[in-house]
Design a protein with these regions (language model features):
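Catalytic cores of the polymerase beta-like nucleotidyltransferase superfamily
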Residues: 2-9, 14-430
């Protein structure tokens, strides 16, 4: 009965948060609409080619093909988002996305290798083998209050109205992600102050962060992801909004939240990311049992950070491994301080992550396997235990154990014996 009452209270709390968020969004749209006639037309900052470091040789060849093709047909076509940010920072972008004035069907007609996806807002995927260049028509925020209310419970409000480069820039999440690269004259276009924030190394919400985070609570996690990954600071008002609204993350779509949690691990910045998750309250919201374990003893928190710091050293070397396996290993490292302090409870402890974060079952089972392997690999490889080297996940379990041993400053002698045995057996097969 108590569980049912607690669940009911949780539902009521989330409903209250939802209505509060909808009210804020409607209010912001009204102010935006009423102020539109009075507002002067803003002009972007345009940084010409000699004044920035982006070179076409660093842009994906197929992305350039899309840009040049759309431009030759008379459409506006820009490189947009994180790709522009990373190029300006001298980093190699993971993705190259295109924004254009061309309608989705017009993009499809321009490329035989184009496929349209999405129901409420059509996106064009221009495929080159296994690679996809995502091409989106410029958007703007919808002014229809009915649409806001109708779709509010589905997660982030979808901007399903076509717009201009300016409106498209303002609907993005953070200023550093609102920059455009113009293929026509090779300039960088900045409507939102992203160039200054890149120079200041600041993550700043576009618009009022209290409203933007209510529109989509997952943006709070994205702020942490970018700040940790880029070694940036979160701007003061944006940070205050996260501290105040962190519990709204519980109203977000579970699969999106789970995906964003695992996006905190790559690039060797998980320790910094989870420190911020803890500081701003998001870790307590999403991983309550792990957070309670940490709160019971201050020394436990430092152990969690220590394991994550060691994982960060491994991330680059393991970047090409299977994504599913990597997430199992990452989850095990995150919970290692708790699980290794209470032997025999690995399934139960990882089960808390399964229930609270809704991680995939495969990730859960792999994380349990990693934790279970600690007892086995802490002893020399005698005959009774040798069968484990034939398990397909043995190399990853060995990596996990090295992370644990190195984080604790212990000898790797026994692990080296297992590694030698594994090398001998695999060499026989070849």
């Amino acid at each position: 009965m108590r569980k049912l009452q607690t669940a009911a209270l949780g539902v009521e709390h989330n409903r209250h948060l939802l209505f509060e968020a909808v009210f804020e969004i409607i209010q912001s749209r009204m102010f935006e609409f009423l102020g539109r006639k009075k507002a002067k037309k803003s002009e972007p900052v345009i940084r010409a080619r000699p004044d920035h470091c982006i070179s076409r040789k660093n842009i994906d060849r197929d992305a350039l093909r899309v840009l040049y093709r759309l431009d030759s047909l008379g459409y506006t076509a820009y490189l947009v988002g994180g790709g522009v940010r990373d190029l300006l920072l001298g980093r190699k972008p993971k993705d190259f996305d295109v924004g254009t004035s061309a309608m989705p069907n017009e993009v499809k007609h321009a490329f035989r290798n184009c496929f349209l996806i999405g129901r409420r807002f059509r996106l064009a995927h221009v495929r080159f083998g296994q690679k996809v260049i995502e091409t989106a028509t410029f958007r703007q925020n919808s002014q229809t209050v009915g649409e806001i209310i109708e779709h509010a419970a589905e997660g982030p409000f979808e901007d399903n109205t076509f717009g201009t480069p300016e409106t498209d820039a303002y609907r993005r999440d953070f200023t550093v992600n609102g920059l455009f690269y113009n293929i026509r004259d090779f300039s960088v276009i900045d409507w939102v102050g992203g160039l200054k924030d890149l120079e200041k190394k600041v993550i700043r919400s576009i618009g009022d962060p209290m409203i933007r985070f209510r529109e989509d609570p997952v943006r709070m996690m994205r702020a942490i992801k970018f700040a940790s990954r880029l070694d940036f600071k979160i701007e003061k008002d944006t940070e205050k909004a996260i501290r105040k609204l962190h519990s709204m993350i519980l109203s977000a779509s579970a699969p999106r939240v789970c995906e964003e949690v695992f996006r905190l691990f790559p690039y060797g910045k998980s320790e910094a990311a989870f420190r911020m998750m803890w500081e701003y309250g998001l870790m307590g919201d999403l991983l309550p049992e792990l957070s309670e374990f940490i709160k019971r003893d201050g020394g436990r928190k430092s152990r969690v950070w220590k394991y994550l710091a060691m994982l960060d050293r491994y991330e680059t070397a393991m970047a090409k491994q299977n994504y599913e396996v990597m997430n199992g290993l990452r989850a095990a490292v995150l919970y290692a301080a708790w699980a290794l302090s209470e032997p025999g409870r690995n399934r139960e402890i990882m089960g808390t992550m399964l229930s609270s974060l809704k991680i995939p079952k495969a990730t859960y089972f792999l994380s349990v396997l990693m934790l279970d392997s600690v007892k086995r690999l802490s002893q020399p490889p005698e005959r009774s235990r040798r069968r484990f080297i034939y398990n397909r996940d043995f190399p990853d379990a060995l990596d996990f154990n090295r992370i644990v041993v190195r984080a604790e400053g212990r000898s790797e002698k026994v692990l080296d014996q297992w590694q030698n045995l594994y090398n001998e057996e695999t060499s026989k097969e070849t």
